[in-house]
Amino acid sequence: MALAGAGSQLRTLVWSACLCVLVHGQQAQPGQGSDPGRWRQLIQWENNGQVYSLLNSGSEYVPAGPQRGETSSRVLLAGAPQTSQRRSQGGPRRRQAPSLPLPGRVGSDTVRGQTRHPFGFGQVPDNWREVAVGDSTGMARARTSVSQQRHGGSASSSVSASAFATTYRQPSPYPQQFPYPQAPFVNQYENYDPASRTYEQGYVYYRGAGGGMGAGAAAVASAGVIYPFQPRARYEDYGGGGGEEQPEYPAQGFYPAPERPYVPQPQPQPQPQPQPQPQPSDGLDRRYSHSLYNEGTPGFEQAYPDPSTDVSQAPAGAGGTYGGAGDPRLGWYPPYAANVPPEAYVPPRAVEPQPPFRVLEPPYLPVRSSDAPSQGGERNGAQQGRLSVGSVYRPNQNGRGLPDLVPDPNYVQASTYVQRAHLYSLRCAAEEKCLASTAYAPEATDYDLRVLLRFPQRVKNQGTADFLPNRPRHTWEWHSCHQHYHSMDEFSHYDLLDASTGKKVAEGHKASFCLEDSTCDFGNLKRYACTSHTQGLSPGCYDTYNADIDCQWIDITDVQPGNYILKVHVNPKYIVLESDFTNNVVRCNIHYTGRYVSTTNCKIVQS
């Protein structure tokens, strides 16, 4: 009986506990509808193979008006990953700094300019589903609100809190410092003209770095603390009043230029005929010498006046002070200022044409032979002299530069000697016609001895331009014996003259060499070599030919002992233009004994 009574009491207690739990649950049902934690809305979407869910505990529509402090809503973003890979603790988090309210900026404007991007660059308002269009107070309140607490981490890695979704609609503990009205949110598909951006005087602007600096700046701003960065200079600081004030100096427009009056070009005055040059007292012909020979010479300027110094002036009645104003290329341009007096146009000095464009009278042609040519030959030689010799380069008349070859007489005098060699060792030189005519006779053998007068040669280009070969590059001749190209037919003439009569006693030859910069003075660079495409002689450089190379000689096998004159002539036919042709010849006195030679009195002469 006792056990039966105890069992019945135990059953009674169990049923009483269940009834209490049931009654308590039924009493909690009426308040469930007002639970702020209840999820009322669910939005799902898929991105990159992952399904996301947006849960909202608030109502879908919020009426316009002041926000009630006792109500709050929660927004939760949940993602369900498709793969089994688990992320770090807390799941993926979106970090986004709340935007600061900028006066005059539309809600959809981006930082870069007026271009509207649909919900891009973090410019979407936080309450885009809760604030009605046209409610400026709600927009300002939503944009200035700062998140105070975040949703705690969930046990599931697929549920994460968003920076903009975990904001509780609670009143801020700090008073709002910037109650400026904001422009309402504008639909991104609506055609509108964005308002011009202006800056207010009383507003304090803050600058924040990327990341969470924006949130920190907003929190400090809401607390009334000035951020420790200097504000950027506003447009008003430079004198611009938002477009209301006119600038002190208006912008200069484009106005048509006034027409230039036409003035006929003055007719050139006839030049007087040059008088014949007075005969110099020393007997030297200086018509083709450098200009330094004529400086300070009385009577030279009168005999050969400079046409560039005689500038014809316009007549007084032909347009006043406007010289050649009809043509912009030749005339006068009006000044920009109206009060500046016009200046007369002064034409540039006429540049003296370089050879062979200018013809001098009387013509002059150096004669290599002692025999006087005929009358017709003089006429033909005069025409040839006009084309080949040309004028002298004068650097004071803005003309182009020309080379100037000068042989070294001391170099020739220091190393002249006699050599005897067998004909079989001179085969390469024989191919280039560097021997006397008796070496090519049928009775000549390889064991015949040839007597050679050897001497070196060093030529300097002391002009202002490169001395280049006259032959085109594709016509240069290749010599297999010497293994180089010959770029000129006649670079130098070597002659042996009789000291008493001046007649040529040894057959000179036409030396054809390849041009190169052997050595250069200090400050000049070597730019040419004896190759197939870079032959020439630079200014300030020397082309040196030692006495032991082929063809650097005169064959004197048939010459008797005696006194002679060695003549070395550079650029003998004046094929390449030079600024001075009077310094191309070197003469030396030679005393030949039959076994050796002595060289004296080497100097530069005219011919």
UniProtKB/Swiss-Prot annotation:
Q: Which GO terms describe its cellular component?
A: collagen-containing extracellular matrix; extracellular matrix; extracellular space
List locations, semicolon-separated: Secreted, Extracellular space; Secreted, Extracellular space, Extracellular matrix
| UniProt cofactor note | Contains 1 lysine tyrosylquinone.
Keywords in alphabetical order:
Cleavage on pair of basic residues, Copper, Disulfide bond, Extracellular matrix, LTQ, Metal-binding, Oxidoreductase, Secreted, Signal, TPQ
Main localization (coarse): secreted
Positions of post-translational 2',4',5'-topaquinone modification: 545
Region annotated Disordered, chain positions: 63-111, 237-323, 362-388
Q: Where is this region: Interaction with FBLN5?
A: 334-402
Say what happens when this gene is deleted.
Answer: Mice do not deposit normal elastic fibers in the uterine tract post partum and develop pelvic organ prolapse, enlarged airspaces of the lung, loose skin and vascular abnormalities with concomitant tropoelastin accumulation.
Catalytic reaction annotation: L-lysyl-[protein] + O2 + H2O = (S)-2-amino-6-oxohexanoyl-[protein] + H2O2 + NH4(+)
The protein here is known as: Lysyl oxidase homolog 1
Q: What is the lineage of its organism?
A: Eukaryota, Metazoa, Chordata, Craniata, Vertebrata
